[in-house]
Amino acid sequence: RMREKIGRMKLYEPAEFIWTFLRDRLEFRPQPGPVAVHVTCSMRRMGLAGVIVSLARLCADEVVVPEEVGCCGFAGDRGFTHPEVNAWALRKLRPVIERSGVKAGYSNSRTCEIGLSARSGVPYVSIVYLVDACTTPKENPGA
C-alpha cells in the first residue's frame, strides 16, 4: 500500500533490493539441499513473485515453492487472534515440506514466517538470512 501512496520515493521490498542493487556485488555459493520459499500476497500484487524465487535459486541447490499454498492466511497480525485462518490456509503445507526434505523456509514477511513455521514443522525466516549465508562480497564488484 505504501508504494501506491508515495509517488516520488521508490520503496524496495528486501528481495527486490538485493536483486536490484546487491546481486552483482555478491559471490553466490549455493547451499546443498532443498529450501522452501513462500511468496507473500504483497509480492504477488507488486509483480515480484519471480524475484524471491530467483534469488533463492542463486542460494540453494533446490527451491521448493509449494503449489498447494497461496496466501498463508496470517493477514498481517490477524493470525495472532484468528489462528484458525492460518491453519486452514496452510493445511497442505506440511506434507509438501516433509515429502521434499526441506529443512528451512524463506519468505519476506515476519508475520507470514511465524505462521509458516508453526504449520510446516521447519523454521521460516527472511530471505535475507539465506542470502547472507550463501554469499561473500565480490573482490571487484564492477568487474
Q: Which residues are covered by each model-predicted region?
A:
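Iron-sulfur cluster-binding electron-transfer modules in prokaryotic oxidoreductases
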Residues: R1-A143
